[in-house]
Amino acid sequence: MPSMPIHSEDQYTYKLSVIVAVYNVAAYLDECLSSLHRQKRTDVEFIVVDDGSTDASSAICDQWAARDCRFKIIHQENKGSLLARKTGVMHSSGQWIAFLDGDDLFADDALEHMCSLADNCDADIIQFSIDVFNCNNKDQHDNILEYVNKPEKILKKNDTICASSFQKKSISWTLWNRIYKSSLIKKSYAHIKDVHLVCAEDAYTFFIAIFFSSKLFIKKTTPLYFYRLNTGVSTSRETIDLFTKHLSEITIIEHIREFLTIRAAEKSWFDACTALQTTLTNIAVYRMATLPEKDLPAALSLFFDTYDPVVYLPTLQNVFSGRQDTLACAAHTAFKQKDVRDSQTAHQRATPTEKKTVGIFYHRYFNGGVERVISQQIPIFLKLGYRVVLFTEQVCPEKEYPLPSEVIRVIVPDSYAQGRASIFLTALREYDVDVLCHHSASSHLLLFDLLLCRLAKLPTVLTRHETLAQDMSVGADYPFTPPTIFQLADTVCALSSSETYLYQQYGVNARYLPNPISVSAHEDIDAPSATGNRPTVLWVGRLFDLHKNYKEALEIFKKIIEHRKDVLCYIVGSGESREQNYIQNFIKIHKLQNNIVYVPYTPHVDRYYNSATVHLLTSSSESFSMVIAEGKIHALPLVTYDMPWLELLKDGKGHISVRQHDIEGAADAVLMILNDSILHQRLSYEARESIQPFLEYDLAGAWKEILETPQKIQPGVYQGEAPSNMRLLCDHIFSMYREGRRNTSSSFRTKEYIKQFMKNSPLIKRILPIGSRRREFVKKVVKNLYHRIR
């Protein structure tokens, strides 16, 4: 090789400088530097920066410098690849700059092509094509090439380049597949912070470079650069040590924002920076998801300290949707280790206020038992002197329960992908919420709502309106919330003592607390209800056949009417059109128009309790059934499917229980009460007596204690290191349930796809009415067709 370089026509000594940052890549470095040595051009220099390598890399660099005068070696203490490149750039003398990683290669004629591009393309950044090697996965190989290699185009404005790279992601932010004018890249590095960085340094440098650029030329060439896969920090198998290193990459966002602020950049640049923040955060979530479970608590602890929950919660929800119990256990351990609860709340008030503010969340405020509970809970909180903020996802003024004027209403999105975290958190801070009462314990968003509150250091009280048995019994496509998630709440209010005991075995701070029962509903009812002129049987509930069994209620009504033609039966509740159509068709087919009346949702259900003779309940599972409570308030004898865990039924008074799904038995029990006035009177008085302890319960006092000290550990909460025998048994049951759900989930999804097709097609609705034989035949055809396509 010649000993003297060929000078360019301007002030630069060389046509092109190649910067090679080296750190502990001895296994690949010789091959890398050899690819430079084979370049035929002499008007180039190779600046190799040894960034404090502890292997043989340093010696290999020196050997090549002795062999080829184009190599210039700089040895420095370890500063990270960002500053290693910066050192190389600032020591370069070329008109153009190219980058080569120490484990990658240049094509034999790469520099010839690069210099030709520099001479013939009027741009300050020129992109060329690359290839990937050491990759056994064709899809991965093709994906990288699709991301890096792009069709020829010219981007003439720097903000266009920025949007293309960081928002549209139509071009990569990698440094090594481009050459840069030396003046541009040196100016860029002059504004880059001297920070130790081994990840995302390309994004940082490229962002600053395009800010100062005026044109990027993308050229389709033969591969000039060969990218070695599965050796660098960004492609290595994730470990907790690597994950910790990766955490430093998010710091570039702060540096970029500072850079943009100083230069009073336009909003579009800040938007691009935010998009980059989201991308880096999402990458970190995916990396964390690949860690062994034993490392997840430590990773989460670091992650929570580093990243913004508003940015990462949507991706966290997406990535861990099928591993929520794993994430919950790891998060609980992480929070426990960090002891975040000892610090002050994250959102400080501008001025102290005497009133405590309580937030209440449920997805809606109409049409349901939980909503009715909340409508009765709000006056209790107001009477205690608290301010109340009601959070819901839906709003329907014409159907909602009355809301006191002093209650603040906030609507939040029903998805983290739609900005739920930001809107929720902003409102919690704006209204100085001191504690959040969350009523949606079976929501697929519960875990992430609890994480958001824990990270904001906001105490949460979770009310569990369902039972675990209910969740596990209604089908594989129904949300099942493992008790481990409840550990993230400060207090869990369960509606039965048996559920309370179960949660406590998981270390959940659970306590039994009955639902509020409206005073207005019972204050004027001092005697058993009269049967009236016509015996009446009442069924109240949502038309959700999965565990309310309204279809079985209709069959029970039919059998009762066969024996008592004078009986009037009411089925009161809301449901989708198909459920309502089913009821109407059932009544019509069996010619029961004079005996069965369907009443859609109404907030004035008391009038039906007042006129009823017997109350019927056909649920497979309930927790604290407001329907039972209201029936007992009205002194109605109850016939119910057996649910021995219910607090409202434990005393055995005021009701007759039959086996689950025993239609004959339920009909016989109702007829027995209708035909025996003495039995009716006894059960009626028992019902009134049975509800009395719940009416006298000091619910306001219990809630005041919870809201003032939500973190107070309740008696009975298991705090041992080793799991209790009860927990081990339940863990086994839950694991077997999940295994079974995985095995059947595809069949449930198939049914759901078919159901949606039949439901949403206008043509199908028109020519195939619900309940028709033709409709059932087409359903079978669609199902078979779907399986064939699968």
Predicted features, each with a name:
Residues 582-600:
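Nucleotide-activated donor-binding/catalytic signature segment of Leloir-type glycosyltransferases, i.e.
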Residues 620:
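Aromatic "clamp/platform" in nucleotide-sugar-dependent glycosyltransferases that forms part
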Residues 652-663, 672-677:
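Conserved acidic donor-binding segment of nucleotide-sugar-dependent glycosyltransferases
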Residues 390-397, 540, 568-582:
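Glycosyltransferase donor-sugar binding loop
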Residues 50-59, 80, 576-578:
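A conserved acidic beta->alpha catalytic loop
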Residues 369-376, 535, 544-559:
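A conserved mid-protein helix/loop that constitutes part of the nucleotide-sugar donor-binding site
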Residues 123, 285-354, 720-790:
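Membrane-interface aromatic/basic loop that binds lipid-linked glycans or pyrophosphate carriers
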Residues 105-220, 225-244:
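Donor-binding/catalytic cores of nucleotide-activated saccharide
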